[in-house]
Regions:
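Conserved long hydrophobic alpha-helices within structured protein cores
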Residues: 37-50, 76-79, 119-126
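PAS-family sensory modules
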Residues: 1-56, 138-139, 143-162
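N-terminal capping loop/helix in small sensory signaling domains highlighted by a polar->aromatic N-x2-3-F motif
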Residues: 65-68
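Conserved hydrophobic beta-strand signature of PAS-family and PAS-like sensory domains
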Residues: 59-62
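Conserved, structured regulatory domains from eukaryotic proteins
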Residues: 98-108, 134, 146-158
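PAS-family sensory domains
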Residues: 54-55, 95, 103-108, 115-125, ...
């Protein structure tokens, strides 16, 4: 977890950060929408989700929805380029993390529930669905992105459907 103040930035800095986020989204989204048009529905539903690029070292986040930023309390500049491990903390179950790592390493899809940490250190149970986005090039299917949807739930036994 990160050690930092819990204060919100001044409005002018927050506005600049929001402008930078929207500029980033405008640059990143078009090629993603081309291969996975459902992303538009996720955005319209204010869903919490991220998109990562497994072709880059560490499978970094290349897109974070406004819902993700709201859920986690992190600004866009503290999210992009990082792996989602920054949401883990001392109460996060290593066995669940290993399941996620195995699925991602094998290009597979997975649904798990784990304890995550917001920027302010508060915890939330997170039902996570991770799915690979693939496209066929010259007769070969290539893994382009992972989309990770996050649904905060009340407890590990809650599947998020209530």
């Amino acid at each position: 977890m990160e050690e930092e103040g819990h204060d919100n930035p001044p409005p002018d800095i927050q506005h600049a950060a929001n402008a930078a986020a929207h500029q980033h989204w405008d640059n990143v989204l078009p090629p993603i929408l081309e291969v996975h048009p459902a992303v538009t529905a996720f955005l319209e539903a204010n869903a919490s989700f991220i998109i990562t690029d497994p072709r880059l070292p560490g499978n970094p986040i290349i897109f974070a929805s406004p819902g993700f930023l709201l859920l986690t309390g992190y600004p866009i500049d503290r999210v992009l380029g990082r792996n989602c491990r920054f949401l883990q903390g001392p109460g996060t179950d290593p066995a669940v993390v290993a399941q996620i790592r195995e699925a991602v390493d094998n290009g597979g899809d997975i649904a798990v529930t784990l304890l995550n940490y917001r920027r302010d250190g508060s915890t939330f149970w997170n039902h996570v669905l991770i799915s690979g986005v693939r496209k066929e090039f010259d007769g070969r299917t290539t893994l382009l992105y992972f989309i990770g949807l996050q649904q905060p739930i009340r407890s590990p036994s809650d599947d998020g459907s209530t």
